[in-house]
Design a protein with these regions (language model features):
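Histidine-acidic residue clusters that define the catalytic metal-binding segment
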Residues: 1-4, 123-162, 321-350
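His/Glu-based metal-binding/catalytic segments typifying zinc-dependent metallopeptidases
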Residues: 10-29, 180-234
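M16/MPP (pitrilysin/insulinase) zinc-metallopeptidase core fold and M16-derived inactive scaffolds
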Residues: 17-83, 226-242
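Acidic/histidine-enriched segments that form metal/cofactor-coordinating
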Residues: 57-152, 276-279, 291-317, 460-463, ...
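Non-catalytic, conformational "gating/processing" segments within enzyme and secreted inhibitor domains
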Residues: 146-178, 355-359
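C-terminal regions of mature proteins
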Residues: 162-168, 299-421, 429-434
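Acidic, Ser/Thr- and proline-rich intrinsically disordered linker/docking segments
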Residues: 364-379, 388-391, 418-499, 557
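Membrane interfacial helix motifs at helix-loop boundaries and amphipathic/re-entrant anchors
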Residues: 516-543
């Protein structure tokens, strides 16, 4: 049984355990509460709170998720009391002397962290806001100051916005949670960058991934288990197409949950995996759900609910529900809801999941044939403004008072200043604007015939709080036109065998006729000629000069062809 207590004004959850004591202090703040221009502030604050503690004999860690941040430890009661007391002290009096060091550690952490198949999904669904921010680097780190962190801590890391959970016999003696007073913060509203669903996008990953948002309920978590069994059977056991087939269910804190399913593949089997994945989804959508799969998933959950450690294991999710204001079920209530789930309930979840689904497909593939609309990669509109041509290509940049647009092959890209989530600014004048809808536009002054004031116009219109100054780039990394004169120089055309003889014949003929014509013209001016003869002689001279030009023309054209 989970007891609800109070420690220094912080709601506290206590459950017995037969193993080592462990505890966590969880706050209702995460990456979804940040802006892209200040992304990384919660993660940095988490690192600063832990930095002075040094090495520990027991497991100690912190974690920053989209809607919560937690500090947890496993060890003796005394060690846990010391750890959590110190964390709270550091949160109220941040060790900002380590600010630059921890920033570098976070940059190193990001650069050394491998990419996962699902990393880009949040930005495709949500854009460059709230739940989509986890897809981006922590670009805000460089500009964050000690005052920024103190203000963030004062707003989010408070007694009312925290929950303590302990798996052990009792609250450790000497534990003090000296946190400032504040208010419980609501979960941010989730934005959407998808004009219609179901939708799909193309990724460089070899995996096929389903992302869906469903109403949080027991039947939805059961559906995730049924889907995983179906994918395993179809793509691994029967087809031998995938090694990894998984499905998961994660509450979001706002009455909804994220459901994700994944199947990997070899390059030569991507087509078959995509087809098998879609077939499995279609099977569940039309209600072809195996009762045996449903029974197996429910039985597995019931086995977990019957273990001695069930209450201790449920503490983190129980704390999450307290923070987000969602209902916590007792073990008996959870067991009763599991038993009540039937095939019709799972079918209802399948329809809901697929109606709002986002499917990630490998590069070179599509999913419109299965009823999924392509997620937008271009903007629906443009802005009016001064036009600047690309030095290479046919693209055109428009810089206006409302935003910037690029018009070129594939359709326009537009970022309006009022909807700009972030602008990265380099000292050499380059700018990258990212819209709330995740549309990104890079402006390289070296690649456009820009007026010197164009960049200043953009800088003056993007709100200062959304601008991040980037370090200077190596000159070799600044793009340059391929040729200083404009288009790339072409190789001369290969000479044909007949060109030289034609040029020689044309030249000799033009020289002979032109010379004779020159002498005749000169004679007309230095000799007496009867008036009756002048008319036809000048006609002969005119025809002669025209013939000379015609004979010389092949030489001129062939020489121009060689340039």
């Amino acid at each position: 049984m989970i007891q609800e207590l109070d420690v220094d004004g912080v709601p506290t959850l206590l459950a017995p355990t037969g193993g080592p004591m462990r505890a966590g202090l969880t706050f209702r703040v995460g990456t979804a509460d940040e802006t892209l221009a200040r992304s990384g502030i919660t993660h940095l604050l988490e690192h600063l709170a832990l930095a002075p503690l040094g090495l520990a004999d027991y497991h100690v860690n912190g974690a920053t998720a989209p809607v919560f941040t937690t500090f947890h430890m496993q060890g003796s009661a005394q060690d846990i009391a010391t750890f959590l007391t110190s964390v709270c002290a550091n949160l109220t009096d941040l060790p900002t002397g380590r600010l630059d060091v921890e920033k570098e550690i976070l940059r190193t952490e990001h650069s050394s962290r491998g990419t996962a198949a699902v990393d880009d999904i949040p930005l495709w669904r949500h854009g460059a806001r709230d739940f989509g921010i986890t897809s981006y680097p922590e670009w805000g780190l460089g500009a964050l100051t000690a005052d920024d962190l103190r203000q963030w801590a004062a707003r989010w890391f408070t007694r009312e916005n925290a929950v303590l959970w302990i798996a052990g016999k009792s609250v450790p003696a000497g534990l003090r949670l000296a946190l400032p007073s504040g208010v419980r913060q609501p979960v941010p509203a989730a934005s959407s960058a998808l004009p219609q669903t179901p939708a799909y996008f193309v990724s460089g990953s070899r995996a096929v991934v389903l992302d869906a948002v469903v109403r949080r309920r027991t039947a939805a978590s059961v559906f995730a288990g049924v889907l995983e069994r179906e994918l395993y059977r179809a793509l691994r056991q029967d087809g031998g197409l995938s090694y990894q087939t998984t499905a998961g269910y994660e509450p979001r804190g706002d009455g909804h949950a994220t459901l994700r399913a994944l199947a990997d593949s070899l390059p030569e089997k991507q087509d078959a995996v995509l087809g098998g994945f879609v077939d499995t989804l279609a099977k569940l959508r039309v209600g072809r759900i195996e009762q045996a799969d449903l029974d197996a998933v429910v039985a597995k959950r019931e086995d977990f609910l019957g273990t001695a450690e069930v209450d201790a294991a449920r503490l983190p999710s129980y704390a999450f529900n307290v923070l987000t204001g969602e209902r916590n079920l007792t073990v008996d209530e959870h067991r009763a809801e599991l038993k009540a789930v039937d095939v019709d309930d799972v079918h209802e979840v399948a329809r809901e999941a697929l109606a709002g689904a986002l499917l990630m497909v490998p590069e070179g593939y599509r999913a419109d044939w299965a009823g999924f609309a392509a997620a937008p990669t271009r903007s629906a509109g443009t802005v009016a403004g001064t036009a600047y041509r690309e030095k290479e290509g046919d693209g055109e940049l428009h810089v206006g008072v409302d935003g910037v647009s690029w018009l070129g092959h594939g359709g326009p890209l537009t970022v309006r200043y009022a909807e700009c989530a972030l602008m990265l600014a380099w000292p050499d004048g380059a700018r990258q604007l990212i819209g709330d809808d995740a549309i990104s536009m890079r402006i390289e002054p070296t690649m456009f015939d820009l007026h010197p004031g164009a960049i200043r116009v953009i800088d003056s219109q993007v709100p200062a709080g959304r601008q991040v100054v980037m370090p200077a780039r190596d000159p070799d990394r600044i793009p340059q036109p391929r040729a200083a004169g404009g288009a790339e120089r072409r190789e001369p055309a290969k000479r044909s065998w007949w060109e030289i003889p034609l040029m020689v014949v044309s030249g000799l003929a033009a020289l002979a006729i032109g010379g004779a014509n020159a002498l005749l013209t000169l004679g007309m001016f230095i000799t007496e000629t009867a008036e009756s003869d002048k008319g036809w002689l000048w006609g002969v001279i005119t025809v002669g000069w025209l013939l000379t030009v015609i004979l010389a023309l092949p030489i001129v054209l062939l020489r121009r062809r060689r340039r």
